[in-house]
């Protein structure tokens, strides 16, 4: 389109906007156009020029008329496009209105739901208030109060249960195999999130049916009468539609479930084979069980201990992890080991192997420097069984200090004062807790002194310090209660405390107070366990200086006959007076420390020669696991080797038959008399001298073939002439003549 046409189009649009499109205005416009003088009249030109100008005007008129016709066509097109644009705008506006209406409806629904929730909460609060008014006040016992404090203190974080996260913090992802392990797709273990152990791709497949976890609430402790009254009142006052808040509170009154493992017949038979294998004292018999039943827990744990004695730590860890994985695959759907409401008691015989698998797993993880994960597993074992049958109290202090959970250890020692709510043994009667709690408080005090705190934190710390005892006092009480710990601890650290006194050098640990044992070696086993496990936590120079200063203070108090010395020593003597040393003898040192009784190299070489090197059960790579067997359970290793079982039995039978034949041949040879190496020929009639015998054998008539012919002739009755000297003579000259 030309510039003139665009200008005229703009002019027309302006006229439309001003609403001056009537006929009168058009006439006026025409008049105005006609009244305008020609442009060339102002130049005073001649008539010819006027004629030319008239021609030019006519041409201009024609051009203008053609342009006007084009403009009219364009206007018509624009007018046609206007309703389409209006329709598009109207559709967009309708969509926007619909969206606004939908958003308003959603907001209204949300407001209604919020109002309903508020009304329901108000109703619940009113009902709870009525229940509290109508029911007698609930008086919590000391055990229930301790149970609440215990659950708050022993909360378990699932993030800390993964040892890979701790290894990442220590070494990074590049320096470990974690990054490569995650890339491997374990398709037959992928459908379930595991808590303790993530299975490896080379492990055998699993299946269910060999053992099951079931609820055994018959062993549950009966609820108190207060709980019974509260539950009855809630059921009578509430309607049929009970709110979820009331349901949760009703369940929290008595929400503890007891679980136990139940073996199937096949697993019981495998267990009998395991007991028979133990009587042989041959680890290869256990390997034979694992080959056909790769998830038998007791066999896996026993082989793990054998691998530790042969210094094969990787295989020991694999065996223990497989045992934990087998236990985790039979979890009940209500069994949640992290809530603290599930009990898995050790007193049931079929629970012991699974309980022991978690305990051995703690040792394996602790040797890998995953101390925080080991601490969380210790908490789980204590929540499963309050009686602490495996003496987790002897190792939980070590993992608390190594994982820098000082506040947890101090609160456990000073607030709870017992390892579990139902356990009556005070933690101040254990040497490991007395010394470890003092060390944890020492680290907390150092953290407070080094960090700059705000006013709020300083006030809170002053309140806590007024209630809690300082690290110096805790350590002095530990030294007074258990003075026999100092000397073996310093010997393990390869140091001594010596000070100059009266011109002489005196060693503090050789003082009679620390050297003499008032308990008469009743707790020597506990002292040895503590020293072998925790000596690494005391080897820094700052801690040794702190220990030395408190040893000097204790000796001064002993010399001054401070009343605290007599009070603490009398309480310890009264506690351990009736305890024999045999009580702690079953606590094996290797179970509670890194000390392992290893086998001699010649025994290890003999075991490797017998095939003890490659004993881990492997998954069959040629056979894919069936889809319905990928969701959990144990024992599919039996199906893996089931197709090869008959062949192996045939091979074994053939070997037995060969062995029996060899034994029979040996017996037959032993029964027969031995034949002499040189036997005399009875038919020989020659001289006895060996030289003459040799010359005699060279004679032609003593040829054995001739003698045989004579024997044949004698038997047939025919007589042959006696051999002559020229019998074998050949005349070659006659043969030459015949040829010629």
Swiss-Prot record:
<keyword id="KW-0678">Repressor</keyword>
<feature type="compositionally biased region" description="Low complexity">
    <location>
        <begin position="30"/>
        <end position="41"/>
    </location>
</feature>
<protein>
    <recommendedName>
        <fullName>Ribosome quality control complex subunit TCF25</fullName>
    </recommendedName>
</protein>
<feature type="region of interest" description="Disordered">
    <location>
        <begin position="221"/>
        <end position="243"/>
    </location>
</feature>
<keyword id="KW-0804">Transcription</keyword>
<keyword id="KW-0175">Coiled coil</keyword>
<comment type="subunit">
    <text>Component of the ribosome quality control complex (RQC).</text>
</comment>
<keyword id="KW-0539">Nucleus</keyword>
<feature type="coiled-coil region">
    <location>
        <begin position="54"/>
        <end position="134"/>
    </location>
</feature>
<comment type="function">
    <text>Component of the ribosome quality control complex (RQC), a ribosome-associated complex that mediates ubiquitination and extraction of incompletely synthesized nascent chains for proteasomal degradation.</text>
</comment>
<dbReference type="GO" id="GO:0003714">
    <property type="term" value="F:transcription corepressor activity"/>
</dbReference>
<feature type="compositionally biased region" description="Acidic residues">
    <location>
        <begin position="728"/>
        <end position="740"/>
    </location>
</feature>
<keyword id="KW-0238">DNA-binding</keyword>
<comment type="similarity">
    <text>Belongs to the TCF25 family.</text>
</comment>
<feature type="compositionally biased region" description="Low complexity">
    <location>
        <begin position="226"/>
        <end position="241"/>
    </location>
</feature>
<dbReference type="GO" id="GO:0031149">
    <property type="term" value="P:sorocarp stalk cell differentiation"/>
</dbReference>
<dbReference type="GO" id="GO:1990112">
    <property type="term" value="C:RQC complex"/>
</dbReference>
<keyword id="KW-0805">Transcription regulation</keyword>
<feature type="region of interest" description="Disordered">
    <location>
        <begin position="640"/>
        <end position="672"/>
    </location>
</feature>
<feature type="compositionally biased region" description="Basic residues">
    <location>
        <begin position="1"/>
        <end position="11"/>
    </location>
</feature>
<feature type="compositionally biased region" description="Acidic residues">
    <location>
        <begin position="65"/>
        <end position="78"/>
    </location>
</feature>
<feature type="region of interest" description="Disordered">
    <location>
        <begin position="711"/>
        <end position="740"/>
    </location>
</feature>
<feature type="coiled-coil region">
    <location>
        <begin position="639"/>
        <end position="672"/>
    </location>
</feature>
<dbReference type="GO" id="GO:0003677">
    <property type="term" value="F:DNA binding"/>
</dbReference>
<dbReference type="Pfam" id="PF04910">
    <property type="entry name" value="Tcf25"/>
</dbReference>
<feature type="compositionally biased region" description="Acidic residues">
    <location>
        <begin position="46"/>
        <end position="58"/>
    </location>
</feature>
<feature type="compositionally biased region" description="Low complexity">
    <location>
        <begin position="86"/>
        <end position="102"/>
    </location>
</feature>
<dbReference type="GO" id="GO:0000122">
    <property type="term" value="P:negative regulation of transcription by RNA polymerase II"/>
</dbReference>
<feature type="compositionally biased region" description="Basic residues">
    <location>
        <begin position="103"/>
        <end position="118"/>
    </location>
</feature>
<dbReference type="GO" id="GO:0071944">
    <property type="term" value="C:cell periphery"/>
</dbReference>
<feature type="compositionally biased region" description="Low complexity">
    <location>
        <begin position="641"/>
        <end position="672"/>
    </location>
</feature>
<keyword id="KW-0963">Cytoplasm</keyword>
<dbReference type="GO" id="GO:0005634">
    <property type="term" value="C:nucleus"/>
</dbReference>
<dbReference type="InterPro" id="IPR006994">
    <property type="entry name" value="TCF25/Rqc1"/>
</dbReference>
<dbReference type="GO" id="GO:0005829">
    <property type="term" value="C:cytosol"/>
</dbReference>
<feature type="region of interest" description="Disordered">
    <location>
        <begin position="1"/>
        <end position="130"/>
    </location>
</feature>
């Amino acid at each position: 389109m030309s510039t003139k046409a665009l200008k005229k189009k703009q002019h027309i649009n302006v006229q439309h906007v001003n609403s001056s499109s009537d006929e009168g205005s058009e006439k006026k416009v025409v008049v105005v156009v006609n009244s305008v003088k020609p442009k060339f009249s102002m130049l005073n030109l001649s008539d010819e020029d006027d004629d030319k100008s008239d021609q030019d005007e006519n041409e201009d008129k024609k051009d203008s008329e053609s342009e006007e016709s084009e403009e009219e066509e364009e206007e018509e097109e624009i007018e046609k496009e206007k309703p389409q644009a209006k329709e598009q705008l109207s559709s967009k506006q309708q969509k926007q209105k619909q969206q606004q209406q939908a958003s308003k409806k959603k907001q209204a629904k949300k407001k209604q739901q919020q109002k309903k929730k508020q009304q329901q909460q108000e109703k619940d609060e009113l009902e709870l208030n009525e229940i509290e008014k109508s029911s007698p006040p609930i008086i919590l016992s000391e055990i229930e109060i301790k149970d609440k404090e215990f659950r708050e203190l022993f909360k378990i974080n699932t993030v800390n249960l993964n040892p890979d996260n701790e290894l990442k913090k220590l070494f990074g992802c590049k320096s470990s195999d974690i990054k490569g392990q995650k890339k491997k797709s374990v398709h037959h273990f992928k459908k379930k999130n595991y808590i303790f152990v993530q299975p490896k791709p080379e492990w055998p497949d699993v299946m269910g049916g060999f053992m099951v976890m079931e609820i055994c609430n018959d062993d549950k402790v009966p609820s108190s009468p207060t709980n019974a009254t509260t539950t009855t009142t809630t059921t009578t006052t509430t309607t049929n539609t009970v709110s979820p808040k009331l349901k949760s509170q009703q369940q929290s009154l008595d929400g503890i479930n007891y679980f136990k493992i139940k073996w199937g017949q096949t697993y019981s038979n495998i267990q009998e084979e395991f007991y028979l294998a133990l009587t042989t004292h041959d680890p290869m018999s256990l390997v034979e069980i694992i080959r056909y039943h790769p998830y038998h827990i007791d066999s896996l744990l026993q082989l793990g201990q054998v691998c530790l004695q042969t210094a094969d730590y990787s295989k020991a860890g694999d065996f223990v992890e497989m045992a934990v994985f087998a236990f985790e695959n039979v979890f009940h759907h209500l069994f949640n080991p992290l809530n603290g409401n599930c009990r898995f008691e050790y007193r049931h015989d079929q629970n012991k192997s699974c309980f022991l698998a978690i305990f051995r797993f703690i040792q394996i993880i602790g040797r890998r420097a995953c101390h925080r994960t080991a601490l969380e597993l210790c908490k789980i074992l204590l929540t499963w069984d309050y009686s602490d049958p495996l003496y987790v109290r002897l190792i939980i202090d070590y993992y608390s200090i190594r994982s820098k959970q000082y506040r947890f250890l101090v609160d456990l020692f000073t607030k709870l004062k017992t390892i579990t709510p139902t356990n009556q043994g005070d933690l101040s009667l254990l040497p490991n807790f007395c010394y470890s709690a003092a060390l944890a408080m020492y680290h907390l005090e150092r953290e407070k002194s080094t960090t700059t705190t705000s006013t709020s934190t300083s006030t809170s710390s002053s309140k806590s310090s007024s209630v809690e005892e300082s690290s110096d006092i805790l350590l002095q009480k530990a030294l007074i209660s258990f003075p026999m710990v100092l000397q073996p601890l310093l010997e393990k650290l390869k140091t001594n405390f010596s000070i100059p006194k009266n011109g002489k050098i005196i060693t503090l640990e050789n003082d009679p107070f620390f050297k003499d044992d008032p308990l008469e070696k009743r707790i020597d086993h506990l002292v040895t366990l503590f020293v072998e496990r925790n000596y690494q936590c005391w080897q820094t120079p700052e801690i040794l200086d702190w220990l030395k200063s408190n040893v000097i203070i204790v000796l001064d108090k002993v010399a001054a006959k401070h009343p605290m010395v007599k009070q603490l020593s009398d309480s310890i003597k009264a506690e351990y007076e009736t305890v024999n040393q045999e009580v702690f003898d079953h606590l094996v040192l290797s179970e509670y420390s890194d000390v392992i009784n290893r086998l001699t190299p010649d025994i290890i070489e003999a075991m490797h020669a017998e095939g003890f090197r490659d004993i881990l059960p492997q998954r069959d790579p040629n056979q894919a696991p069936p889809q319905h067997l990928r969701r959990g359970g144990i024992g599919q290793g039996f199906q893996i080797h089931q197709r090869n079982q008959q062949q192996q039995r045939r091979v074994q039978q053939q070997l037995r038959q060969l062995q029996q034949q060899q034994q029979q041949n040996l017996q037959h040879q032993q029964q027969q008399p031995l034949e002499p190496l040189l036997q005399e020929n009875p038919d020989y009639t020659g001289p006895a001298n060996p030289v003459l015998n040799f010359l005699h054998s060279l004679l032609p008539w003593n040829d054995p073939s001739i003698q045989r012919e004579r024997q044949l002739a004698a038997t047939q009755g025919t007589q042959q002439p006696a051999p002559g000297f020229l019998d074998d003579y050949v005349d070659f000259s006659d043969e030459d003549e015949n040829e010629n």
